[in-house]
């Protein structure tokens, strides 16, 4: 008897930048490759956006769920490709899943941990920094919600970096000036974003401007996380909520 398919829906925030959906599809292909190594069942790994999509997320879940049920599938796993536990992860995605679940009574729609919660995320970020740089800045979007930036502060402390934010203080320029006041000569900057987009382009321009303003200082900016094999590896591990000693490799 053929095995029933297993389905995963990777959910991004959504962006008007065409690079984002393209990178999401690339990541989905890599995740499918990782997961296929540990199962003989047919795998469906697809993508969706919470915002700026052609259809609402709950409708996208229903569409995939209906197809899955027609092929004998019983479980659909939603994997939030979010780096922080903000309102989208806590409230918006669960609300969309609840709407879809009400229309899919024979299907178990599960929400996996969000990407940024992976215990090995810090190790991945550590490898992204240029080791030749003496000082580090981790740049995130930032939140105005009370306590909303605590996760970034914790990650930055783990990495030995200063946290900076795009939308709130302290900004990248402010943190760079603070480091320069200590006499540092080399600064590594890591944008904590999943894919390249308008904000990461603007951060790159800021880094260029800072380098022009401080020609004797060495600046290095890493790429966003991207649709790499390493990121796909983390997503594949989260998709089945494994215990730390049961992580699959790919």
Which residues fall in each region the model found?
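Active-site-proximal alpha-helix that buttresses catalytic centers in soluble enzyme cores
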Residues: 1-250
